[in-house]
Design a protein with these regions (language model features):
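Beta/alpha (TIM)-barrel catalytic core signal, keyed to glycine-rich beta->alpha loops juxtaposed to Asp/Glu
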Residues: 131-342, 347, 351
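Residues at the N-termini of beta-strands
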Residues: 15, 46, 122-125, 172, ...
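Active-site groove signature of glycoside hydrolases
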Residues: 116-139
Length: 352
């Protein structure tokens, strides 16, 4: 599988990254190890995780995904694996350092704990899972100045990362769920103060949420920050498994097996919106008309985007994982690509 260099780093990663958010909740340790083995047999060398996983996050399972990866990783040649993890941002999970800010002490503690769970001496790419500051993320469409709060500065966060790079505990730094302002500020602060420069941004990108194209595409191109695209299947909506009815009258299927039925409806409301389901149904119809599955259409389309360095895929079975990887070999016709743009123009970013 072709490798891509991330940002200005020397990390060379596969065009597909294995996401692991199901390990420890929807997948057992043995199943997680099987997925890792299969992914690497197909040429994937890139794993993404975070201290917070698995999802849905809860105190009882906190860190389980990293522990599962760790028992696999200790049996592998370490230089064969490009490992990415993240530090949780503030205010969402009170069981993670009391939900506190991204202070230097918090970042250092998070790295030390992740290294123990992962059974490794270093993490190749360490990412800030979401901003410490007030920012429009996770389905919030507009910035709200009334939600401003005190938080650790970007300079303080990068200083802590710099200490960890010098100590050999992390190699490169990235951000996640960021905005054009955030990317620009991280790059400017790093260059102004001689601190680690972010190599990557990990943001959602899929057929029902193309918000990356609203300024982040140019920002990342000009700052040489690589996109790691997560949720390419729109939390599973783009597979069609959550839909019943026809393309004109799609209905959510509560009996489907997956994340959107396993967890409470408020877990991912943007993927449950009527307009999201309407768009997903249209993409299903398009995929069927061209002899492919909804998953293959959604992933092949992501794999074809010029600004995506690596697409993060996740699965709960080896069959799903195989289909997701196989989609890399599907080239979408000009007719299909034009149809995608027509649907997008009619139902614009419903899951943003």
């Amino acid at each position: 599988m072709k490798k891509i260099r991330l940002g200005r780093s020397d990390l060379e990663v596969s065009r597909i990254c294995l996401g692991t958010m199901t390990f420890g909740e929807q997948n057992t340790e043995a199943e997680g190890h099987s997925q890792l083995d299969y992914a690497f047999s197909r040429g994937i060398n890139f794993i993404d995780t975070t201290e917070m996983y698995p999802v849905k996050p809860r105190a009882e399972t906190y860190g389980s995904t990293e522990r599962i990866i760790g028992t696999w990783l200790k049996k592998q040649p370490r230089d064969r694996v490009v490992l990415a993890s993240k530090v949780a941002g503030p205010a969402r999970n009170p069981w993670i350092r009391n939900g506190g800010d991204l202070t230097p002490d918090s970042i250092r503690a998070a790295v030390e704990d992740s290294l123990k769970r992962l059974q490794t001496d270093y993490i190749d790419l360490y990412q800030i899972h979401w901003p410490a500051r007030n920012a429009p993320i996770f389905g919030q469409k507009r910035f709200n100045p009334e939600a401003e709060r005190q938080c650790a500065t970007i300079e303080a966060q990068l200083e802590a990362m710099g200490d960890l790079v010098r100590a050999g505990k992390i190699r490169y730094v990235g951000v996640s769920n960021e905005t054009p302002w955030g990317v620009t500020e991280f790059v400017n602060v790093a260059e102004r103060h001689g601190l680690p420069r972010i190599a990557t941004i990990q943001n959602p990108y899929n057929l029902v949420n193309r918000s990356f194209e609203q300024g982040l595409d140019e920002t990342c191109f000009r700052t040489e920050v690589s996109l790691l695209a997560y949720s390419p299947l729109g939390f599973g909506q783009l597979t069609g498994k959550y839909l019943t009815g026809d393309a004109n009258h799609p209905v959510f299927n509560p009996d489907a097996v997956g994340r959107l039925t396993r967890f409470s409806p408020d877990w991912s409301p943007r993927y449950m919106r009527a307009e999201t389901m309407a768009a997903a149904a249209r993409y299903q119809e398009l995929a069927r008309a061209h002899g492919m599955s909804g998953a293959t259409l959604a992933l092949s389309w992501c794999y074809s985007r010029w600004f995506i360095a690596s697409t993060i895929i996740g699965a709960t079975s080896l069959a799903q994982l195989k289909e997701n990887v196989d989609a890399l070999d599907t080239a979408l016709s000009a007719e299909v690509l034009s149809a995608v743009e027509r649907i997008h123009a009619e139902i614009h970013n419903p899951a943003q």
